[in-house]
C-alpha cells in the first residue's frame, strides 16, 4: 500500500474573478436557451424540439446550443424541469400563502385555472407531452411523468389537509377527490383550447364547487380567475424557483 498525498481542496477554492464571470455568463446563456426552448415547445411540443430549431430561434450556432446540453434528449428534459419549476411557482407556491384546508385547495385550483387560461394559445406541456410520450419509454417520458406525479401528490396533500381540518369528509378517498379535480383541469384545457368554448372556465369553477359539496366542503366563488380566452400572465414569464413542494 503506497502513501498518498492528502486530498486537495482545490475544488473548494473560489474561482478567480475571470473564471466566475465565465461561469456566470455560461449559466445565463443556458438559462436563455432553456427559456427560448420552453417557448418553442409550448408551440410545437416537446417532440418538435431539436438542437437546430432552438439554435435558429436563439440566433446561436448548433454547436453552441449542443455544448450546453450534449444531446437533444437532455435539452427536452431541461425544458420539462424548467416548466415544472415555473408551474410550481405560479400555481403551488402562490397557494401556500393561504391557510391549510379549503382556502389552500381553492387557491390551488384557482391558480391552476389562471394558468390554463394563460396557456390556451400556447398549450400545456404536461398535457401535450402526455399525448406525445404516453406510449413511449425513456428518460424524457420519465422526467415528464415524474413532474406530473409530483404535482398530483401536492394536490392530494392539499385535499388531505382539508380533510384533517374537518372541511372535507375524512371517509372520502383523497386520491379520488384529487383525481376528479385534475379531471376538471383536463376538461377545461380541452374545451377552452380545442373547442374554444367561452364558458369552459365557468363550468370548471362550478364543477369544483360540486366536488367540494359532494365531499362535504363549501367554497367561496373566486373573483380573480380570468374568463376562458382572456389573457393572463404567461407561464414562461414567471420567475424560476428550485424548491420542492412542502408537506405543510
Identify the function of each model-found stretch.
Residues 28-39, 43, 56-57, 74-97, ...:
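Alpha-helical structural segments
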Residues 1-44, 48-57, 74-77:
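Basic, helix-initiating cap at the start of DNA-binding domains
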Residues 1-28, 218-248:
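N-terminal intrinsically disordered/low-complexity leader segments
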Residues 36-37, 58, 162, 178:
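Small-residue (primarily alanine) positions within well-ordered alpha-helices
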